[in-house]
């Protein structure tokens, strides 16, 4: 990976981290792109260039988190033989995901309070995949 690609990945990571913080604090409707840009240390145009509009940003934040959660669950379930081991692996995955993504619980609580109206379809698919893994 060259220096330009490294800077691009770092910029996107900062944008996604800042967006997760903003969505946790204010919800989808209350989060402002200007605030996210300030938190990330970029101008607003960089967000639109790298990610897109606020809906695309929200989708990307949640899709990344739930993709990570699914990968953790799959890895933790790999060696779980008994139902008891599977429950432990599932709980471990939840705790690991929350530890890595501390903004997830407030974002999801706000989403549930809003009736899921802002939950992107791709994220609903991610959740279904996670549920399918444990079923």
Model-identified regions with their sequence ranges:
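Amphipathic alpha-helical segments used for helix-helix packing
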Residues: 86, 99-124
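Hydrophobic alpha-helical connector segments
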Residues: 74-106
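Alpha-helical transmembrane segments of multi-pass integral membrane proteins
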Residues: 59, 63, 92, 124-125
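N-terminal intrinsically disordered/low-complexity leader segments
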Residues: 1-10, 17
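Helix-turn-helix
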Residues: 14, 18, 22-56, 60
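Amphipathic alpha-helical packing segments from all-alpha helical-bundle domains
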Residues: 67-74, 100, 117-135
């Amino acid at each position: 990976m060259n220096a330009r690609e490294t800077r691009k990945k770092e910029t996107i990571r900062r944008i996604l981290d800042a967006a997760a913080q903003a969505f946790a604090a204010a919800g989808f409707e209350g989060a402002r792109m200007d605030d996210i840009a300030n938190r990330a240390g970029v101008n607003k145009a960089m967000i639109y260039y790298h990610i897109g509009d606020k809906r695309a940003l929200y989708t990307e934040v949640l899709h990344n988190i739930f993709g990570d959660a699914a990968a953790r669950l799959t890895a933790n379930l790999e060696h779980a033989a008994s139902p008891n081991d599977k429950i432990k692996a599932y709980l471990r995955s939840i705790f690991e995901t929350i530890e890595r993504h501390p903004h997830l619980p407030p974002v999801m609580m706000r989403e549930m309070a809003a009736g899921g109206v802002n939950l992107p379809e791709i994220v609903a698919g991610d959740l279904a995949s996670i549920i399918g893994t444990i079923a």
